[in-house]
């Protein structure tokens, strides 16, 4: 009550911020008459003037009013577009490192030019992050005209571009690219073998377009550079033949072999299912039924493959979660409906889906480097973003990224009419109503955008509309190449466009069609008369569509997130245009089936509702919103959980990457090597000749053997001690240290100082990279099984932190020892050999990168089952308990004398 009273008196925080920013808008507007009088040359001369003032120590905030006024005037002269006052506010919000929520059609691309221009004046680079390559290239080309006119350089990065071009793009004042490409290049830079091989020059300031899509929807997807591992795909194919014979349970305790946890995207075998699976695997020749069971230690790999195959068959659906194109399984993004070419699910899931679909099974991947988008973007010194829908996720933006959301008012009031949801008993009734609505709109010339959540639904609707004779276009992952054309025509009279989630499409639907696209089609030689004729024709269509009610939005299903629904709605009613929207739901929709309360379904059935009966009720709408809030909270927990774990990895990643940077930047690493060598020798000697110990505790022969095997040094310590009985442990350590130093000095004298320095640097980088790669695999294994610690009344996250630290400490010690051992034993005769080594290593890295992929790590519920932990225990060499008595087989008689099999008696799995 007090809060609401204070808000009424002083306004909300958002209103107070807007009032402060409006004062600066007044200053910018006051400068406009003066700036307008400047000639082109005088206006362009402002850029070097601003740069000098900033270099002399003037703060960006002081330069802001004048810089924004200059950018606004340049936009008017070069692009023919003048920034509105609300766009100036949006630009200031972005400059302050916040998120600007701006409705669709409010000109976010133009807004970004203001803070981009201002921050690029520092000369440290500005990254503009988009959701796809098309938008990156389009925005770089369109807005690049403005920046180039103002004297700033613009680059764009995209997959597969030549190295020199990419390096030049990153050296530009402003760089456009996708979140994937910026993240991928960051990881690649940290696999580079020399400074010259790196692309980026630091993460200074980023503006993220569609910030909710990138920082929230994709936050569950770690960005992974992975290369093929050495496993065989044959087992996936053999297990795939077995899985269709297993039967799904309709209820968790019903009959069948397995049940599906749809929330967590996991599959669990029942007791009967384990027996049935074991029997089928024996019949298929995968298991030896006489001597081993499914859960015998040597068969844990089979368990892993079986779980992956079950998930592939029971959870992942073709044309919903993925499509098959050109003999490959391509993931479909659940949020945007786009295909994610090059991305693969991890943990063998992608291979299992390939086996299911009968396409060539590619080898499993090994992680070479990884980072989450959360930790990537938190590394920028300043981060901001813009989107049409951020306010529903304001808490997450603030708690994870420290980003405040500021809602920017629209330039013109929104007059779109949002109708209440209509709820049907089943999908058939729902789609009948959807088709009737579409046909009615088409008859009166009103364009319709139909939003679906899967390719399957979009194609089913397309078939029905084709039968009814309604002309339409389908925009989904399969029509990705025609996207721009389809969207450009979606606002024409009676146009019907069926689209999978429109989130992040980045192109406005203009009533009457895209005038800009039509004029572009005329070509550069078009006369003014031709352009005028096209414009007049477009104006007629524009007026006709407005009269018909503007763009009508039909939602065929509620998405898990309210934000995605709002994005679909936001495609209509842009810049004060008329429009309308309605969502059609059924009790068979995933959201309603999994998350909505059972009483809603019971009540509708008790009321005797039939297929085509519809219910419009606030109570039901509230239940739907409640269900969406549940899912949003569930997904937030998953993302927060992922971040908690990745923060541990991130601390380690920072240490390793800082060491790599130090190595790449250093002219010589001799001091590092000398320090490492002293530490390693001290530890080795202390193991065999402990400090302050007596000679009875010494193992001189063991020390001699280690020195010979690790360093190629022959040193008779037993003879030395016989000759000099007064030698104590410290003296022996000094003698060994002296001999090792002498050995290194002799090696350096033989090859020359310059060659030795190059070799030291090469060996340190190679060992560090290989050890880090192996460490990432160990961290994956640790994380997958860590949740089982909860059963032992231990806190999994704390256990993970503790063991991750121990693994990291061990890795650093191993790096030291490996470096010294390699440098001791390597035989190099010339500098050319070192260069040849580096060239070969560089080729290997490039080969790995050419085969590497964005691995779309599936982190459904981010938990692990017991079998996974057992797999990791076996792989990490954890000691197995030794039995005093023979092991009882699951099919053997129970020792209790009941006459039952052990698995049905005291060996029954709980």
From Swiss-Prot:
Location, primary (coarse class): membrane
Superkingdom: Bacteria
Membrane topology, as annotated: Peripheral membrane protein
Family of the protein in this entry: Belongs to the SecA family.
UniProt record, GO biological process: intracellular protein transmembrane transport; protein import; protein targeting; protein transport by the Sec complex
Cell location: Cell inner membrane; Cytoplasm
InterPro entries found in the cross-reference section: Helicase_ATP-bd (IPR014001), Helicase_C-like (IPR001650), P-loop_NTPase (IPR027417), SEC_C_motif (IPR004027), SecA (IPR000185), SecA_CS (IPR020937), SecA_DEAD (IPR011115), SecA_motor_DEAD (IPR014018)
Binding site for ATP: 87, 105-109, 508
Needed cofactors: Zn(2+)
UniProt-annotated stretches for the region Disordered: 558-580, 873-910
Disulfide bonds: none
Reaction equations catalysed: ATP + H2O + cellular proteinSide 1 = ADP + phosphate + cellular proteinSide 2
Top-level taxonomy: Bacteria, Pseudomonadati, Pseudomonadota, Gammaproteobacteria, Lysobacterales
GO annotations of cellular component type: cell envelope Sec protein transport complex; cytosol; plasma membrane
NCBIfam families: PRK12904.1, secA
A Pfam family recorded for this sequence: P-loop_SecA
Annotated residues for binding of Zn(2+): 894, 896, 905-906
Official protein name in the record: Protein translocase subunit SecA
PANTHER family listed in its UniProt record: CHLOROPLAST PROTEIN-TRANSPORTING ATPASE, SECA INNER MEMBRANE COMPONENT OF SEC PROTEIN SECRETION SYSTEM
Keywords linked to the UniProt accession: ATP-binding, Cell inner membrane, Cell membrane, Cytoplasm, Membrane, Metal-binding, Nucleotide-binding, Protein transport, Translocase, Translocation, Transport, Zinc
Subunit structure: Monomer and homodimer. Part of the essential Sec protein translocation apparatus which comprises SecA, SecYEG and auxiliary proteins SecDF-YajC and YidC.
Gene Ontology molecular function terms on file: ATP binding; metal ion binding; protein-exporting ATPase activity
Cited function: Part of the Sec protein translocase complex. Interacts with the SecYEG preprotein conducting channel. Has a central role in coupling the hydrolysis of ATP to the transfer of proteins into and across the cell membrane, serving both as a receptor for the preprotein-SecB complex and as an ATP-driven molecular motor driving the stepwise translocation of polypeptide chains across the membrane.
Composition skew (Basic and acidic residues), residue ranges: 558-568
Amino acid composition bias (Basic residues), ranges on this chain: 900-910
